[in-house]
Regions:
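A short alpha-helical cap/connector motif
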Residues: 1-116, 123-144, 148-186
Length: 186
């Protein structure tokens, strides 16, 4: 990762801490996601919840090494504007496709298959996002869902679903605010 991108990420960390509407993942979660993408060889990433693009930059920095792309979905116009500016500053515009809309409506319209999915949006809707995207995930795709410890009660249906689903193997990673990591085995 180039120094300018590291500086941008640090700037976005401070911005996120000072602006409640921008809930960025912690840096250790970003690093963990980056490592997962690199070692898995993921080439097509689906991100639900772009916010200001902080997590997207972590994902895009990793997937560009795999010669891949991030498709990210965000509904809020003001967040989209910030994210686009940040992608340009990170020189990652060609690696990221940002789609405006409600993920519940956008996911069914997506073409192609994904190797990696990161969910960090409306907690109660995580299960909807996964069910809608499931057929678009390749075998051995990784699904990561943020806030599995911090918002465990809001995510209880999602957590029960991924932990009991016959086509998934799932584990809680106690990093940041908790990351539920699932592998699509079927």
């Amino acid at each position: 990762m180039i120094e300018a991108t590291k500086r941008l990420l640090r700037e976005l960390e401070v911005f996120g801490e000072n602006n409640d509407g921008y809930y960025n993942i912690p840096p250790d979660t970003g690093t963990f996601l980056h490592i997962l993408v690199r070692i898995s060889g993921a080439k097509n990433i689906l991100e639900i919840g772009t916010s200001n693009g902080y997590s997207t930059i972590w994902l895009a920095e990793a997937v560009k090494h795999n010669k891949g792309k991030v498709t990210t979905i965000e509904i809020a116009d003001h967040k989209i504007a910030h994210a686009k500016e940040n992608f340009k500053r990170a020189k990652l515009e060609d690696t990221i496709s940002l789609i405006k809309g409600d993920a519940v409506r956008v996911i069914p319209k997506l073409d192609g298959k994904f190797d990696f999915m990161f969910i960090d949006a409306v907690k109660e809707d995580y299960i909807k996002y996964l069910k809608l995207a499931y057929s678009k995930l390749n075998s051995n795709a990784l699904i990561t869902a943020d806030n599995a410890i911090m918002f465990e009660k809001l995510m209880k249906d999602y957590l029960k679903y991924v932990r009991e689903h016959k086509g998934l193997k799932s584990v809680l990673i106690p990093i940041g605010s908790g990351l539920e990591l699932s592998l699509k085995i079927g």
